[in-house]
Amino acid sequence: MIKAVVGANWGDEGKGKITDMLAKEADIIVRFQGGANAGHTIVNNYGKFALHTLPSGVFYSHTTSVIGNGVALNIPVLIKELNEIVSKGVPAPKIKISDRAQMVMPYHILFDQYEEERLGGKSFGSTNPVSLRSTQINMQKSVSR
């Protein structure tokens, strides 16, 4: 049986927690979009974790976690999260990453910081380079493969 958890409110709906509950019996969990600006907190037998890049299925050894092509993939954040969960005793997760996942590059982060500084008190709230990365996808100038 296929189950999908989809949000319609730009986040903060509890999708990560619901996905974690469903992951207990899932063979595959797919994170299909979003970036490290989004996050969800999972509390389980291993401890409390704030995930920003990893799919919720990483805590279940029988589950394959997929990072899909719509994800703004920030490699340093991914590595940090992997190291954090493994250091707390979570078995190394089975992860597959789409070869079309969009890479967050250092210039995306710098551009986001400069834009926030330029806007000053009228800033839109950092999206942690997701907005620039999304713009580049729409312009077909993103970095993948």
What are these regions (language model features)?
Residues 1-145:
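Non-transmembrane, aqueous-exposed alpha-helical and coiled segments at domain scale
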